[in-house]
Amino acid sequence: MEEILSLIEKYNKQYKKPGLMFNCEMIPAENVGVKHAKWDKEDGFKVPRDCYNSYFYVVENQNTNVLDKFKLHGERYIKHLTGGSALHCNLEEHLTQDQYRQLLKVASKEGCNYFTFNIPNTVCNDCGHIDKRYLKKCPKCGSENLDYLTRVIGYMKRVSNFSQARQVEASKRFYAKF
C-alpha cells in the first residue's frame, strides 16, 4: 500500500502546475462515497459494496484489530497524503482511562495524528434520553423506540438521518471490544 501511495504522491507532484494541482486524501463524504461506488459500477469496475469509506481497511472486517487500524492511519502511510486521513476508531463501549491512555500512546508511536474514538450512543425517540452506550431499551422510560448516534464522516449524527446507502453501511460496521 505504501508503494501505491508513494506513486500517487509522485505523480501528483510531477503534474502540478500553476492553476492545476492534484490531491490525495481519504474523504468520501457522506454522499460522495456512495456516488463514487455507483459511478465505478456503471463504468464496469468491480465494486464489492455500495459505499466507499475513507479507510485503508474494510469497516466490517472483524479481523482488523484496533492496533492495526492505528498503524494503517499512521505516519508510514499518511505522509503520502495531502489531507483527509482521519481514523474513526469504532469501539463497542467506552474504555477505562488507562485503556484510552494506552491507545493514545499507540497513536503517538504510529504517527496517527488525526483520529477520534467512535462509540455508538442510544437516543430514545419517546422520552429524548441519550445514553453513551448501545442499548436495546431506554434505561429511563423502558421504550424500545430507539435511534443511534454514530459518526458518518466525523460528526455524530442519528443513523436514521444518514442517507439510505450510509444506513446500510453503518449497520455493517464492526465496533471492537477492547
Go through each PLM region and give its residues.
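Long, C-terminal-biased catalytic regions of enzyme "large/alpha" subunits
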Residues: M1-F178
